[in-house]
Amino acid sequence: MRAVLALVLLLSLAGCFSSPVVHFYVLASPEGEDISARDREAEGPRVAIMPVSLPGYLQRPQMVVRQGDDVDIRIEDFHRWGEDLSLGIARVLSLTMTRDMRSRRGVAMPLRTGAPADYRAQVDIRRFEGAPGGKVQLEAAWSLSRDGKTLRDGVFRTEGEAGASMADMIEAQSDLLEELGTELARTTLAADAGSSQAERGRDGRQSQSGGKKRE
């Protein structure tokens, strides 16, 4: 009898407590005019965003919050990404690059779309976390290549301040990715301008060579 009463008591207590709500988040798309790459025909440089690599501690659906120093992190079981983080990063980068290359009618797309590309951008995330009401940080190694040859590469570091909520932190992280996308767009346009100038130089030399008369 006591065992039955104990079970009833446990069930009653369980009914008094509701399970915590799990919140899901996605990275914010960059602001700007209509930048849907699928709706426009690229006439300028076309960039494929290669699959983004993440450090092991970020390869999880739960969000990661850094606690005060460089070694202490907290895994948030009730705050989760609503999309694969690497895919979300590629999405924000491609949209930002497309927006920032619009003056040259350039476009950037994740490689998985299968769209034709002149350049490939590789991004390896080394650090991408923060804390609500504190700092958010991004560190990423990147490279831009064409025809299998690396044209430019570097390490991008930036940080910002987040508001008090988890959503505020995601907004701040999205802003950091937008900064990286702008840097990649600027690099792509510079590399493409250099390639175009070199091609014009080769065409000019070939034209001059073809125009010489034989004696």
Predicted features along the sequence, with ranges:
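Sec-dependent bacterial lipoprotein signal peptides
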Residues: 1-16
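A structural "domain/chain start" motif
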Residues: 16-85, 192-215
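Surface-exposed short loop/turn segments
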Residues: 17-34, 42, 95, 100-148, ...
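Soluble periplasmic/extracytoplasmic beta-strand elements of cell-envelope proteins
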Residues: 46-52, 64, 120-124, 137-143, ...
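Short secondary-structure boundary motifs at beta->alpha junctions and helix caps
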Residues: 70-82, 149-186
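Structured, soluble extracytoplasmic/luminal domains of envelope-associated proteins
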Residues: 77-101
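Sec-exported extracytoplasmic/periplasmic mature domains
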Residues: 94, 98-102, 185-193
